[in-house]
């Protein structure tokens, strides 16, 4: 489940001059902080498409031999359109229920890695929960890219406890599936 910290969300600055065109493509979820209600699937991939006007997202993972996926819309967050900061909104429809997720890109080189972050304040608990994802254009972080990501995580250690990351599995066995299932669409809830 979520990891809670006392008080409000900390003040965080996403990357400046965010380039959605360069960010587009398939990203492998190398690791993530535990997140309540998120899949525990393997072989998790987020694919961002952008044609210069409209953007979309296709998230997929494999669980028990089934490739489950969600399709949604993607746009730069309203407060980031003019500041050019790396904040975007993903909108998924599960039947009548609409879910908006707002990841912030803390760091990326657009070609090899990205570190996404999100914080939610929970007034009932007077606490916030932090979510973070390490993304890569390849199935593993190696060499210089791994070193860069480790160093970036050190600079954000006041926000993200890297020891809490859960690694994803991109082995051939974990990624095998025999059927697909859409989590989004008019008949899903």
From Swiss-Prot:
Gene3D superfamilies: 2.40.128.20. Synthesized only in the caterpillars, apparently by the epidermis and secreted into the hemolymph. The protein is passed over from the larval hemolymph to that of pupae and adults and is sequestered in the eggs. InterPro entries: Calycin, Invtbrt_color, Lipocalin_ApoD, Lipocalin_CS, Lipocln_cytosolic_FA-bd_dom. One of its GO terms (biological process) is response to reactive oxygen species. It comes from the Eukaryota. The keyword Zinc-finger does not apply. One of its GO terms (molecular function) is pigment binding. Disulfide bonds join 9-119, 43-175. This protein binds a chromophore: biliverdin IX, isomer gamma. Mixed with lipoprotein-bound carotenes, this blue protein provides hornworms with their green cryptic coloration which serves a camouflage. Belongs to the calycin superfamily. Lipocalin family. Homotetramer. The molecule consist primarily of eight antiparallel beta-pleated strands, which enclose a hydrophobic pocket, and an alpha-helix. This is Insecticyanin-A.
């Amino acid at each position: 489940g979520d990891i809670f910290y006392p008080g409000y969300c900390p003040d965080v600055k996403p990357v400046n001059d965010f380039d959605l065109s360069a960010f587009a493509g398939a990203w492998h979820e190398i690791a993530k902080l535990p997140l309540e209600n998120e899949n525990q699937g393997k072989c998790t991939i987020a694919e961002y498409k952008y044609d210069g006007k409209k953007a979309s997202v296709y998230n997929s993972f494999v669980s028990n031999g089934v490739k489950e996926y969600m399709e949604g819309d993607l746009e730069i967050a309203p407060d980031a359109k003019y500041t050019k900061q790396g904040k975007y909104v993903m909108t998924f429809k599960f039947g009548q229920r609409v879910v908006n997720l707002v990841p912030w890109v803390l760091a990326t080189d657009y070609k090899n890695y990205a570190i996404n972050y999100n914080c939610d304040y929970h007034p009932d608990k007077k606490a916030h929960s932090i979510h973070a994802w390490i993304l890569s254009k390849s199935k593993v972080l190696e060499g210089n890219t791994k070193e860069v990501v480790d160093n970036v995580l050190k600079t954000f250690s006041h926000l993200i406890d890297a020891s809490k990351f859960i690694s994803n599995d991109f082995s051939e066995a974990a990624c095998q599936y025999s059927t697909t299932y859409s989590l989004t669409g008019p008949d899903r809830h």
